[in-house]
Regions:
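Intrinsically disordered, low-complexity, mixed-charge
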Residues: 1-81
Length: 81
């Protein structure tokens, strides 16, 4: 199991980005949370490394058309389970 914290900056609020992140994680069977912050969107995801890598690739490739990702900061966390 792998757990990562993400900070996503760019045009990621008011464009359906947070619900997109939630659905993507749910569809891949990942757990965690996603929320808006004053600087963008923050999320934590946890699951098998392969699925987290898929999540990160799809996050950029399938993002909402009106969104723009300028920067993603990743931090590895200790798995909760």
């Amino acid at each position: 199991m792998v757990r990562k914290a993400l900070k996503i900056r760019g045009i990621v609020q008011g464009v359906g980005f947070r619900p997109f992140v939630y659905r993507l994680a749910r569809d891949l069977g990942l757990t965690g949370y996603v929320r808006n912050t004053s600087e963008g969107v923050e999320a934590e995801i946890e699951g098998p490394a392969r699925k987290i890598n898929t999540f990160l690739k799809r996050l950029v490739r399938e993002k909402p058309a009106a969104s723009r990702i300028d920067r993603v900061t990743l931090k590895i966390l200790r798995p909760s389970a």
